[in-house]
């Protein structure tokens, strides 16, 4: 149990801006093997990030005047909260992949471009479009009129968004681990943003990772119907399968940036699936 907590805190330290310092950092410890093992808690980071996003959305819905644009403003600031909390870690991967694969059809040249820390035209477009998709879908979910059952009071539609944010951040962080399991790592580990993390994962590690996801889905079912969650997860899985095929064809494997891209695309797909099912 203590090892479980250490690995989780190491993942928190690595994937978020939350400080794990001083005596706590000494207790957690560090080694390349521990960092690799902490990858199974990738979905668990979604508990924190998604929780912060949901709290921001709910707070602004409560404090702001009730207008047509309130869900849009709340969605925008909840997205800002997630970007700040993660340091744009996954968005950076999306931009690098867009620059690399958009800038060259040659595999080696694409990998070289992806190592460049500068953001190009393709990366900028991908970032803007991804953020717009997130905000638009969350605002749409927040503006859905919740239809009550006979004899029940009208439901608070913001719970849709809070449940979507929390669950979407968890599920979308579990699916990239399937990519680690199925594809070889083709990046330069010495300079990879994920370092020894983006290497390999066992079936047992996947089981731990998906226990986070299944637990989140079980709790989310209190706010969302099962069919909503099934469709949302279905969209995310389809996005994952598409990216697996795409990266296998273009790169013959994955890099740390590909994992960040997968998280972003699967998160958007989750919100889209949820919106379609409501």
UniProtKB/Swiss-Prot annotation:
The lineage of its organism: Bacteria, Pseudomonadati, Pseudomonadota, Betaproteobacteria, Burkholderiales. GO terms for biological process: cobalamin biosynthetic process. Pathway: Cofactor biosynthesis; adenosylcobalamin biosynthesis; adenosylcobalamin from cob(II)yrinate a,c-diamide: step 7/7. Coiled coil: none annotated. Its cofactor is Mg(2+). It catalyses: alpha-ribazole + adenosylcob(III)inamide-GDP = adenosylcob(III)alamin + GMP + H(+); alpha-ribazole 5'-phosphate + adenosylcob(III)inamide-GDP = adenosylcob(III)alamin 5'-phosphate + GMP + H(+). One of its GO terms (cellular component) is plasma membrane. Joins adenosylcobinamide-GDP and alpha-ribazole to generate adenosylcobalamin (Ado-cobalamin). Also synthesizes adenosylcobalamin 5'-phosphate from adenosylcobinamide-GDP and alpha-ribazole 5'-phosphate. InterPro entries: CobS. This is Adenosylcobinamide-GDP ribazoletransferase. Its main location: membrane. The chain crosses the membrane at residues 44-64, 69-89, 121-141, 161-181, 204-224, 227-247. It comes from Polaromonas naphthalenivorans (strain CJ2). GO terms for molecular function: adenosylcobinamide-GDP ribazoletransferase activity; cobalamin 5'-phosphate synthase activity.
């Amino acid at each position: 149990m203590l090892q479980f907590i250490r690995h989780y805190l190491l993942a928190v330290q690595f994937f978020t801006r939350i400080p794990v310092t001083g005596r706590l950092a000494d207790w957690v410890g560090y080694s390349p093997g521990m960092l690799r093992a902490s990858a199974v808690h990738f979905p668990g980071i979604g508990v924190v990030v998604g929780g912060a996003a949901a709290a921001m959305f709910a707070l602004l819905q409560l404090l702001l005047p009730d207008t047509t644009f309130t869900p849009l403003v709340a969605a925008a600031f909840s997205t800002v909260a997630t970007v700040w909390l993660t340091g744009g870690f996954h968005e950076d991967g999306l931009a690098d992949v867009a620059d690399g694969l958009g800038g060259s059809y040659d595999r080696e040249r694409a990998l070289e471009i992806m190592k460049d820390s500068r953001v190009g035209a393709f990366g900028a477009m991908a970032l803007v479009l991804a953020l717009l998709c997130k905000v638009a879908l969350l605002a749409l979910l927040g503006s859905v009129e919740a239809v009550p059952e006979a004899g029940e009071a009208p439901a608070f539609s913001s719970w849709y968004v809070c449940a979507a944010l929390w669950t979407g951040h968890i599920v979308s962080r579990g699916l990239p681990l399937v990519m680690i399991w199925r594809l070889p790592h083709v990046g330069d580990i010495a300079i990879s943003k994920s370092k020894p993390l983006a290497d390999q994962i066992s079936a047992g590690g996947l089981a731990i990772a998906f226990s986070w996801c299944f637990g989140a889905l079980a709790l989310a079912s209190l706010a969302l119907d099962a069919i909503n969650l099934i469709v949302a997860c279905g969209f995310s899985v389809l996005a994952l399968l598409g990216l697996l095929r795409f990266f296998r064809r273009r790169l013959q494997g994955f890099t740390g940036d590909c994992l960040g891209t997968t998280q972003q695309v699967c998160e958007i797909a989750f919100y889209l699936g949820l919106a379609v099912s409501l």
